């Protein structure tokens, strides 16, 4: 069996084992995959929609103008990416006993953790698509192929981040704690709870008050859109909430970040993987 086939086989088998054990012993089992996203959306919609009176952009083709649905798409997409990176980062340290006893391609641990999470994410996307069908019509069904491509790109990005951070956490155990702090900041910097139009308004208001850079408004929106997580969230919202294809700039950004980070992560992992067991 070639190395590539072995990696794929081990990845699938380990992901299946993780999936089968995830809800083992719970009364509701796989139903939690449907309950969790709905509950999460309800909480965020209540806090940021009702209490803080958040506003959502109007869907391009769907005509939807619901903050609950808008933030719902962002929350489940963010949770997938954030949880995937966290799981990938913890894969090596969390399986140190296995790594010191059995030899197998180390990257399989990161691949399988993200693949198992993607399985749950597929259920959550199904819930969102069903809700969007009810709220905005069947137009969202035409976006499913695009959503699949976006998810595959997001998986590449998440795996790449997992590869980088998993190696870093082996050599520097504080990385896991630092990441939890950074992750909170990153969430709010990715537009999970506020729209691009709200940010544009802030930029315009600041310019009106004299906050400029070389006579031009502060490049808040430009910097904001360099954030890879924001690009993926924008792509998901465009398709699932707006029933429209993302702009070519968003597509280009998602592809560049996905393959760039995955490639970088693979290089770093390959460079340091030989010494992982020694450090563990």
Go through each PLM region and give its residues.
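Hydrophobic transmembrane alpha-helices and immediately adjacent juxtamembrane helices
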Residues: 1-280
């Amino acid at each position: 069996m070639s190395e590539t086939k072995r990696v794929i086989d081990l990845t699938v088998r380990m992901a299946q084992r993780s999936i089968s054990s995830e809800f083992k012993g719970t009364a509701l089992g796989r139903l939690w995959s449907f309950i969790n996203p709905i509950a999460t959306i309800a909480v965020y919609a209540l806090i940021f929609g009702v209490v803080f009176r958040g506003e959502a952009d109007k869907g391009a083709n769907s005509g939807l103008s619901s903050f609950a649905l808008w933030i719902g798409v962002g929350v489940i997409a963010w949770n997938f990416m954030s949880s995937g990176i966290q799981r990938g980062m913890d894969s090596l340290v969390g399986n140190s006993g296995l790594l010191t006893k059995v030899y197998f391609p180390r990257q399989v641990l990161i691949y399988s953790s993200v693949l198992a999470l993607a399985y749950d994410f597929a259920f959550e996307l199904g819930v969102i698509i069903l809700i969007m069908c009810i709220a905005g019509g069947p137009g969202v069904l035409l976006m499913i192929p695009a959503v699949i491509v976006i998810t595959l790109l997001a998986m590449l990005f998440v795996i790449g981040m997992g590869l980088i951070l998993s190696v870093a956490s082996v050599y520097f155990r504080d990385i896991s704690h630092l990441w939890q702090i950074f992750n909170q900041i990153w969430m709010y910097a990715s537009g999970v709870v506020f729209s691009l139009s709200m940010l544009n308004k802030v930029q315009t208001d600041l310019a009106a008050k004299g906050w400029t850079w070389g006579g031009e408004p502060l490049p808040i929106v430009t910097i904001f859109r360099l954030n890879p997580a924001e690009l993926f969230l924008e792509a998901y919202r465009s398709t699932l909430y707006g029933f429209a294809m993302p702009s070519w700039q968003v597509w280009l950004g998602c592809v560049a970040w996905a393959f760039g980070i995955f490639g970088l992560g693979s290089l770093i992992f390959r460079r340091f993987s030989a010494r992982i067991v020694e450090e563990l």
